[in-house]
From Swiss-Prot:
Keywords: Hydrolase, Nucleus, tRNA processing. The lineage of its organism: Eukaryota, Amoebozoa, Evosea, Eumycetozoa, Dictyostelia. It comes from Dictyostelium discoideum (Social amoeba). Its EC number is 3.1.26.5. Residues 291-324, 333-351 have a biased composition (Low complexity). This is Ribonuclease P protein subunit drpp30. One of its GO terms (molecular function) is ribonuclease P RNA binding. Component of ribonuclease P, a protein complex that generates mature tRNA molecules by cleaving their 5'-ends. One of its GO terms (cellular component) is nucleolar ribonuclease P complex. It is found in: Nucleus. Residues 275-290, 352-366 have a biased composition (Basic and acidic residues). The gene is drpp30.
Amino acid sequence: MVYYDLNIDSSLPEPKIKSMLSLHTKYGYDSVAITHTVEGKIGYKDVCKIKKIQIEDDSEKSTSSGWMKMGDSNKTIKQYTRLQVICKTMAEFQMITANNPVVQSYDIISVVPYDVSVFNAACNSNEIDIITIDTFSKFIIKPERVRQCIAKGIFIEILYGNLFGIDADRIAFFQIASSLVRSSFGKNIILSSSGKSSTTLRSPYDLSNLGHLFGLTFDQAKAAVSKHPHTAVLHAITRRTKGIATVTDPNLLKDLELWKLERKEDTQPTNNNIPHEKHINKESTGKETIPKPTTTTTTTTTTTTTAKTKTPTPTPTTEKTPSIPTQPPQKPTAKSNKKTTTNTTSTAQKQGKMDIDIDNNKRKRE
């Protein structure tokens, strides 16, 4: 694992920079960037004058694990040059172009936006590699702009050196860091020291634990000091050479090819048309079939009746014969229950009267 710190101030005296580089090697860092900061518009006086510092003592031996041990590895620390421009207006930001010789003289280009318009323009720019969010950036960061920045391959840098300052800087650091993590979901975030004092420098493992305080997972915090800075350096190489470069180190060529493949996978669609398992019905035969949508159709039928008119046909005239009138057949009518009950009661009364009359006649005869 390769660890990076991409922000060491170049305005410090050379002995102090040398002591800081030796401390970086003790903590396990493999690469650093010495930064030249410009406030406002850049000019010819800002052409890169940074020289690589030679460390001759035994402290240049670093560790591969990131712990403070000496003499376990013979790796020498790599040094990159970086231009950091503090932009307050769009006129200052528009000076950063690929045709500018000042920009071409540095390995990495970064911007510190102090205005929301500069930040929005930087998220859609092809001329920079890193956007540094400082505690002086007093504007609201929108998630849409952060995701646009990620799609462009630009990284957002957070300086953890502000934690060791006053309370206001500490509060502003956690507010900015937590909002960036929520907007980017932990992608394309770089953690760097301010590079002004050796007391603010921390090891990569300390930074991995620090990332938990503002929402990063352990892997994301570890990538913020290893994978993401490494990808930013590769992005700077392709930006400077416009995709065509002569690479003498085969390991760097391998990293460039892997980075291009990762970028292609992130930007191109996957063309994955296979549905999820929960959307697939498994029949008894064991085959998987995609359920077809069922549609119900309702049909309505209408019937129309047409009245047929019969034309009268002429009948021959014949002599009339007297005919016997016939009564029309009477249709049987259904009697109700009330009528049947009244009929039965009337017949019973009649039979009772007849019985009384018969008894009276017998008595008279006697």
